[in-house]
């Protein structure tokens, strides 16, 4: 089993094409240490069609053993380096690390705008710029497209929390507190007071989680009836295996991301004191005993200000999402559809559902098909 730190991490990384060059992007702030400089990858084919694709990468844990690196792994599907396919069609491609890992949407927007300016200054002015993002990076891509329609001609969000980070925080927080109710012996701390060093015990937690869930199938079924987190229900065997996989993925974020999330927003952005949880049986005991968390209003405002999509599209956006996504639930797509409709901008949104269980479980053909749809719509765009 592979935990998804960022999407598309399941294949070996091939050598970079000769058209691609890696380099640091210098910053003007002398307080920024050299190892935290933004790393950039720029690929320009000989037959450049004057269109540029920028990629916003997915979640990388904020712990120091995860350095600021280029997202080469997540750009490889079916042993194919996706930018190489774009280069063959004449597109230039660029991506970068950010100045921090973890909860980075606000930082990522600034860094990718800097990347665009750097490309324009060092390579030339493209005629069209397209933004693509995977998982957490898809949220960044949408916000860039919404906020800077004068700079981006179209966008593609893959398996992304398109409905906004507040909904994603609610999903992750609810799963954690309900998990703790059914399996109280795994964690000795609450959902949002995760110790900074808790990640060092992750391997121990994994062993405990697997044992608890496989030895108490009834409690596992209850957990998923309450949280509605995605599993593959095709058989009892696949239910158990995917239930464990989903739990490990979501609890990974709880342990590895929560301290940085709280620090970045200046408090707890999650509230469940008045939430009613409903499952198969014994809902009264569940609601009496489940951990109740009080949010910090400033942290909630921060999440809404910097991590919430608005739906105010002025350029075409295509989304690609697994129907049974265990990490970023598909209902994000329904939320965003409502936001876009509320802005009367539905003509700019194309959502493509992909059957099956998994996070960012796409084939090369599916990603290229969605990319082609985005290009076709953007090139045919004639203005509001």
Model segments located where?
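Accessory cap/linker subdomain of secreted extracellular hydrolases
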Residues: 161-308
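Gly/Ser-rich "nucleophile elbow"/oxyanion-hole loop immediately N-terminal to the catalytic nucleophile
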Residues: 47-48, 115-135, 151
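Short beta-strand element of the alpha/beta-hydrolase
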Residues: 50-61
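Short beta-strand/loop motif that positions the catalytic acidic residue
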Residues: 318-321, 325
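Short glycine-enriched nucleophile-adjacent loop
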Residues: 138-149
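N-terminal cap/lid segment of alpha/beta-hydrolase-fold proteins
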Residues: 12-52, 285-294
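Histidine-bearing beta->alpha loop at or near hydrolase active sites
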Residues: 348-363, 375
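Conserved alpha/beta-hydrolase "acid-adjacent" motif
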Residues: 326-332
């Amino acid at each position: 089993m592979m935990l998804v730190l960022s999407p598309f991490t399941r294949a070996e990384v091939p050598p970079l094409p000769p058209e691609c060059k890696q380099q640091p992007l210098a910053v003007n702030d002398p307080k920024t240490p050299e190892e935290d400089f933004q790393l950039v990858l720029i690929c320009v084919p000989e037959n450049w069609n004057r269109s540029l694709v920028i990629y916003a990468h997915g979640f990388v844990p904020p712990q120091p053993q995860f350095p600021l690196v280029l997202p080469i792994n997540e750009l490889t599907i079916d042993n194919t380096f996706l930018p190489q396919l774009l280069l063959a069609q004449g597109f230039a491609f660029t991506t970068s690390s950010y100045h921090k890992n973890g909860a980075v949407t606000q930082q990522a927007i600034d860094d990718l705008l800097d990347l665009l300016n750097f490309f324009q200054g060092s390579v030339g002015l493209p005629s069209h710029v397209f933004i693509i993002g995977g998982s957490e990076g898809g949220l960044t891509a949408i916000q860039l497209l919404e906020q800077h329609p004068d700079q981006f001609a179209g966008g593609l969000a893959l398996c992304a929390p398109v409905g906004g980070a507040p909904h994603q925080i609610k999903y992750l927080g609810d799963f954690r507190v309900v998990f703790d109710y059914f399996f109280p012996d795994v964690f000795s701390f609450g959902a949002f007071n995760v110790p900074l060093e808790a990640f060092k015990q992750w391997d121990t937690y994994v062993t405990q989680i697997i044992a608890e869930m496989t030895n108490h199938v009834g409690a596992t079924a209850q957990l998923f009836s309450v949280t509605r987190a995605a599993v593959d229900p095709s058989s009892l065997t696949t239910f158990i295996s995917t239930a464990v996989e989903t739990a490990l993925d979501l609890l990974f974020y709880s342990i590895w991301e929560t301290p940085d999330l709280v620090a970045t927003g200046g408090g707890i952005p999650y509230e469940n004191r008045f939430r009613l949880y409903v499952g198969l049986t014994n809902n009264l005991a569940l609601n009496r005993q489940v951990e109740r968390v009080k949010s910090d209003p400033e942290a909630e405002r921060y999440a809404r200000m910097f991590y919430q999509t608005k739906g105010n599209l002025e350029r075409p956006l295509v989304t690609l999402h697994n129907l049974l996504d265990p990490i970023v639930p598909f209902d994000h797509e329904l939320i965003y559809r409502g936001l876009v409709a509320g802005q009367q901008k539905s003509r700019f949104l194309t959502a493509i559902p992909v059957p099956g269980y998994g996070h960012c479980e796409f084939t090369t053909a599916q990603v290229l098909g969605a990319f082609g749809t985005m290009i076709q719509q953007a090139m045919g765009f004639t203005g509001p």
